[in-house]
Amino acid sequence: MIELSNITKVFQQNGRSITALADVSLHVPTGQIYGVIGASGAGKSTLIRCVNLLERPTEGKVLVDGQELTQLSDSQLTRARRQIGMIFQHFNLLSSRTVFGNISLPLELDNTPKADITKRVNELLELVGLADKHDVYPANLSGGQKQRVAIARALASNPKVLLCDEATSALDPATTRSILELLKDINRRLGLTILLITHEMDVVKRICDQVAVISDGRLIEKDTVSEVFSHPKTPLAQKFIQSTLHLDIPDDYLTRLSPDYHPDTTPLLRMEFTGKSVDAPLLSEVARRFNVNNNIISAQMDYAGGVKFGIMLAEMHGNNADIKDAIQFLQESHVTIEVLGYV
């Protein structure tokens, strides 16, 4: 549905050339939710704005539903953009128009008959859960309700693609979850292809099928969400994943934690389990095999892309040689282990 081929975008600023995107290629299959994650300034917004040519690439091709957008005339591009809806971090609603009036605006600009406008807007209000807000003005809506109006407006022309530019970053966590569930529901009901950008791995984890990691204008990793969570290939992907499952070291352990091993201390381990290692009774196995005892301090488990993954803080008691053998066995069983120190 979306094919970006060798996209480069260079901005001119104060006589200097600034490369925002460098040779980026990306394929978003029809009907999928695809996430692009990166830190501020990584090039995310520039990338998504190249899809509908709000930013025209310096080099490369942009294909949406088989059309090469960079080769279209202005009138052809206008028609093609009707198949590409877009929502933003800020809702950009017209304060002088009601909810109905905001959603109907693109249809009015397209000279759609009034009866068809009314029918379509009512369908969309039902879809986004705002059937009772028909005549309400934006000033009387919550942030989540405003974003629902923006989503309905973006869907007014029956687009095949929806672009989401940090669409939940201005919302509180509970509202973010409800908007993500709405996007997932719309994707499922309408078969809509969704490309979203975010700086939060929680967003990717909740609704995306595939994810790409962008850094300094380059895509450094891309795969299914389950594969990236199970086997991250870059330190940045690993960092984003760790941000979704974070366990704090208890204060009483922090006060005793030392970076150096002593014979009377025991290692404090941070263990990450993905794929098959989540369900395997590995800690019981190392206890039997290597004569070590594990004291689990805290643990957490979650799902991403249909795959379970988890994190654990634990002490491992035993003699030093047995502990080293146990850690090596766990690592060979696809458990990622970090020795945080000794207590």
Swiss-Prot record:
Enzyme class: translocase
The organism of origin for this protein: Pectobacterium atrosepticum (strain SCRI 1043 / ATCC BAA-672) (Erwinia carotovora subsp. atroseptica)
Taxonomic lineage: Bacteria, Pseudomonadati, Pseudomonadota, Gammaproteobacteria, Enterobacterales
Function: Part of the ABC transporter complex MetNIQ involved in methionine import. Responsible for energy coupling to the transport system.
Protein name, entry field: Methionine import ATP-binding protein MetN 3
Gene name tied to this protein: metN3
Record-annotated ABC transporter domain positions: 2-241
GO molecular function, one term: ATP binding
Locations listed in the record: Cell inner membrane
Keywords: Amino-acid transport, ATP-binding, Cell inner membrane, Cell membrane, Membrane, Nucleotide-binding, Translocase, Transport
